[in-house]
C-alpha cells in the first residue's frame, strides 16, 4: 500500500531503521548528546532561539503554547478543524477567545484580523495555522504576523506549522511560537511535537509558571541542560537524528524544499489536466486537495484496486475531498504512480477516459520538459 495521506505520512525504510537500534536510556550522557544535537538542528531549521520537544501529538504543543503565552484574551482563525481546535483549547482553560471564521477554502485576511485586534485591546495572543490541513489551505501567515507586530508588538503570534514545517521555508521574524509534529514532514510516527520560541516568548514563559505536564518553563530549564522534565520521546529523537542526516544527504533543506515544491506544483497541474478541481483558493505545498462529488468512491477504489491510499476530508467535507500528501522525502516514481492510479480510477468509474495525461503532465512539469 502506498500511503499518500497528509499525516501520518509514509515512513520510509531509512527512517524505520532508526527505530530498530537498541533503546538508550534518556537519563544518560550518550542520549543527552543526541538530544542536544537534534535541538540544535531544529533551531537552525526553524530559525528561532529555542526549540522544546514534547512527548505528545501536535495538539499538546498547541495547548502548551496557548496557556504559556496568553494571559488575557486570545484571537484565533478558524478555517477548518485545526483552527477550531485553538478555540476549544482556550475554552478548556477559561481563556476568553475571539474567533474569526473563514470558509475552508479561503485564506485569512490581514485587514479583518487587525480590525478585531484594534477593537479588543486585551487580546495578547493570536493563533493561526500556516497550513490548515482540513482543506489544504495556506494562510498568508508571514504577512499577518508582520502586520500584527506593526500594529501591536505585545501580541504573541502562535503559528501551528505542523503541516508546513519541513515543507517550505517559513519567514519567522514576527512569529513567537512555531509548532511542529512528528508524523508530518519528519516522517516519524505520531506522539512527538515541538515548539520553537522567539526571545520574547522565552521571556514570557520564564515569567510564568503554568500547567503541569505542559509547563514550558520547566521544559525550558531542563532542555537547556539536554534533558526533559518527564520521559523524553526517545525513539522519536533518534528518528530526528536520522532525518537530519537524510536531509543533509539530499543537499540540505533548500534542496528538500525545492523537491517538495516541484512535486506539489506538478501534482496540481496533473490534477487540473484531469479536469478535476483544486479545493483551496490558496493551496498549500504540503498537500493537493481535490473537491469532487465522487471523492469517496475514488478513494475507495484507489485503495482496494490500486493500493494507493489518499485521505478524505473532515466534516462537513468528509466525502467531498481527496487529499494527496507531499510532505517528507517521496520518490518521484511513487507520486507518478499515484497520479496514474487516480486517472485509472476515473476511467473505471466512467468519469473520464484514460489517456495518460496525468502522468505525462506530472513528469513534464516536475522535470521542466
Curated annotation (Swiss-Prot):
Residue positions where N6-(pyridoxal phosphate)lysine is found in the record: 184
Gene3D superfamilies: Aspartate Aminotransferase, domain 1, Type I PLP-dependent aspartate aminotransferase-like (Major domain)
EC assignment: 2.6.1.-
Origin superkingdom: Bacteria
GO molecular function, one term: transaminase activity
Coiled coil: none
Cofactor(s), by name: pyridoxal 5'-phosphate
Family: Belongs to the class-V pyridoxal-phosphate-dependent aminotransferase family.
Protein name: Uncharacterized aminotransferase HP_0736
Protein species of origin: Helicobacter pylori (strain ATCC 700392 / 26695) (Campylobacter pylori)
